[in-house]
Amino acid sequence: MLSRISSVRIGTQVRQLANPVVNQSSQVLQTRQFYVAAALTVGSMIFGKQNKLADSIANGEVHDKTVDYEARHQEALEKRLKTLTDTRPMKPRYEGHIPLNLHEKLLLFVISGIRSYYHPENGVNIVQLGEATALPFILEDLKKTMLSDETGRRILREKPNVRTETLDMDKLSKMPKNTFGYTFYSWLKKEGVSPDTRAPVKYIDDPDHAFIFKRYRQCHDFYHSLNDLPIIIEGEIAVKALEAANMGIPMAALGTLLAPLRLKSAQRQRLYEIYLPWAIRTGLSCKPLINVYWEELLDKDVNELRKELGITPPPDLRKIRKERAALRKKFKMKYESYEKQ
């Protein structure tokens, strides 16, 4: 019995003596592992940089700032750009052209359509939606309309660009007040816009179609000024309806159908009773506006020009709005005076 107790005590003492040794060995092992890991990290940083440097030297990229180096660098850059451009369905066909795949065109239509509905004041949305809905067969039909007319053929051949410098605004300001040129100039000043505010075409693939759509876009303000319609939502809808009836532009038709939904009741009533009937009737009966060389008609009497084109201006929208505002103010004052009694 005594011997068994002694052996247990001896075993316990041995384990107690061995534990510090084991703990010390474990600490030494952990310390060694830490130093080894640190050494490997530092070594990889040093030798990794050396390897990169060696690769650069082997490729002739260090201490070789010669024409050959620049040529190789440019070639590498062009290869990278080529891999990006190869994803396009075609090469750009005119300045500023951005070719899109079919799914990209569909996305452009959906996204720009949603944005245009909720933010019609943002011109970028309207521009993108216009090009997304400008289908090739519609633009080709407009091209045939232009080719069937002598002036239209000349416009296609000469490809005029409606800009401030080409119109000579200073000259327009000095024209007689009955001329179309002065009418256009005074309308621009009244509305605070210029011919340079029209965005270039980007997403239409055919160069002729792109020019036709640009021409339609740049001539938009001529229609405004000829009919003295202001740049407010009612005036824009009226001009869009005129364009849709005359040229069949889908974007113009969409604007005519959807934009009135955001109007107030009085505005919508005015539009449906006066301006939409006028726009549709005038657009269907007047000369194709895409065939009008507006730049050559600036010195013409504005009333004679309207008569030649078959256009009769609508009632003055500014005057109607002003009269309604005055009437509302009168009723408001009358109501307030009645409340004070």
Swiss-Prot record:
Any one annotated GO CC term: extrinsic component of mitochondrial inner membrane
Record-linked InterPro entries: Coq4, Coq4_euk
Main location: mitochondrion
Cell location: Mitochondrion inner membrane
Enzyme class, first EC level, given as a word: lyase
Keyword Membrane carried by entry: yes
Pathway: Cofactor biosynthesis; ubiquinone biosynthesis
GO biological process: ubiquinone biosynthetic process
Bilayer disposition of the protein: Peripheral membrane protein
Catalytic activity: a 4-hydroxy-3-methoxy-5-(all-trans-polyprenyl)benzoate + H(+) = a 2-methoxy-6-(all-trans-polyprenyl)phenol + CO2
Top-rank taxon, per record: Eukaryota
Pfam families reported for this sequence: Coq4
Cofactor(s), by name: Zn(2+)
Keywords: Lyase, Membrane, Metal-binding, Mitochondrion, Mitochondrion inner membrane, Transit peptide, Ubiquinone biosynthesis, Zinc
Annotated Zn(2+) binding sites: 220-221, 224, 236
Listed EC numbers: 4.1.1.130
Stretch forming the transit peptide: 1-16
Free-text function comment from the UniProt entry: Lyase that catalyzes the C1-decarboxylation of 4-hydroxy-3-methoxy-5-(all-trans-polyprenyl)benzoic acid into 2-methoxy-6-(all-trans-polyprenyl)phenol during ubiquinone biosynthesis.
Family statement drawn from the similarity comment of this UniProt entry: Belongs to the COQ4 family.
Database matches in PANTHER family: UBIQUINONE BIOSYNTHESIS PROTEIN, UBIQUINONE BIOSYNTHESIS PROTEIN COQ4 HOMOLOG, MITOCHONDRIAL
Complex and partners: Component of a multi-subunit COQ enzyme complex, composed of at least COQ3, COQ4, COQ5, COQ6, COQ7 and COQ9.
HAMAP family assigned to the protein according to its UniProt record, in alphabetical order: Coq4
Listed name of the protein: Ubiquinone biosynthesis protein COQ4, mitochondrial
Native species: Vanderwaltozyma polyspora (strain ATCC 22028 / DSM 70294 / BCRC 21397 / CBS 2163 / NBRC 10782 / NRRL Y-8283 / UCD 57-17) (Kluyveromyces polysporus)
